[in-house]
Structures are given as structure tokens and as C-alpha cells.
Curated annotation (Swiss-Prot):
GO terms for biological process: translation. Keywords: Ribonucleoprotein, Ribosomal protein, RNA-binding, rRNA-binding. It holds the Pfam family Ribosomal_TL5_C. One of its GO terms (cellular component) is cytosolic large ribosomal subunit. Belongs to the bacterial ribosomal protein bL25 family. CTC subfamily. Transmembrane segments: none annotated. It comes from Chlorobaculum parvum (strain DSM 263 / NCIMB 8327). This is Large ribosomal subunit protein bL25. The gene is rplY.
Amino acid sequence: METRALSVNLREVKKNGAAKLRQQGMVPAVVYHKGEETVAISVDEIALDKLVHSAESHLIDLQYPDGKSVRAFIKDLQFDPVTDRVIHADFKRFTADEVVEMEVPIHVEGEAVGVKIGGGKLQINMHTLTLKGKPANMPEHFTIDVSALETGHSLHISDLQATVPAGTIEIIGDADAAIVSVAAPRKEAEAEAEEETTEEA
């Protein structure tokens, strides 16, 4: 996974301080690590937005004015419900040998045979996956090829986990959860529903 640099400044936690920072185009944030004191920082809103809205996940090199830097990743974000701007960020610091949990985006490629030939509709049920492992093993995204997916079939978390080299990363979540599915054409689905109703009667 690629590492991106992000300049940060230390900040004082005081009344109305966060609001003033936002007016200056800065986002209040914190950096934390188990067993250590949480550090209050601020980051440039535009620079943070580029990371947040990237199609890839990244490890981040937080760079302080005194030349110090720490490795971290975005653990949590708070958004303004009206403007959708990032109003607060949590960064989790890590060490190279530490096992962490990170969200990475899902990239879907290919045209499902159930859509191309069967006339079905591709349903994407998840847009990110939560992965557990060492930072060096984390991918920037997870690519799913749906070309062979037929009507009425799904790709589950367990299917993806089977493609991951043993001992590298673990996909967190219900193994039976469907990531993508191909739904039957509407008329076919309605016919099946009517058939089930008739059988029940």
C-alpha cells in the first residue's frame, strides 16, 4: 500500500477552537495509539479531502513542523450533515509489525454473464471491505472480477478470502455476506414469486 505525506500542526484543545480552525480551512483531528496519550492536531482541509475521496486507501506519513513524522492511517471521519465536508478526523498510529484493521475500497471489473446474456441486474452490496493484517500486506483496493457471475448468483466474503494468500490478511465480516449479486430480470423474478405463492396456496 502506498504511503502519502500529510502536513499537520499541533493544536490546543480549547472552547470554540475547532470552529475557528474550520473557518481557516483547517480540520481538527487527533492521533492516537494504544497505551499512548492522544495528540490533538489540525490538517489542511483540501489536502485531507484528496486522501478521503481517493479511489485507493493509503498509509499516511503525518509530518510535523519540527521535522518529526509518524506513520498512521485514517480510522474515523466525521462529516457535516449539510455540506458533507470533513469536520473531524481520527488517525491511528501504527508500527510495522503491528496488526491493524483498515477499510479499503472495492473495485468491480468485468461484465457479469448474468447481465450480458441473462438480462439480470448487477447489485453491489458493499463498497468497502474491512481487512485485518500488517500494514505492509494491505492492498490499496480489492478488485473483484464479476465476469463469470450468473443470474441469481453472488460473490461472498468467503469467496474472496479463499483468494488471499494464507497468513497475510483477513477479511472481517460475515463469511456468507454477499458483496455483489446478479438479480434476475424483473419479469422472471415476478414469475418466480407468483409460482411460490401458488405452491403455498
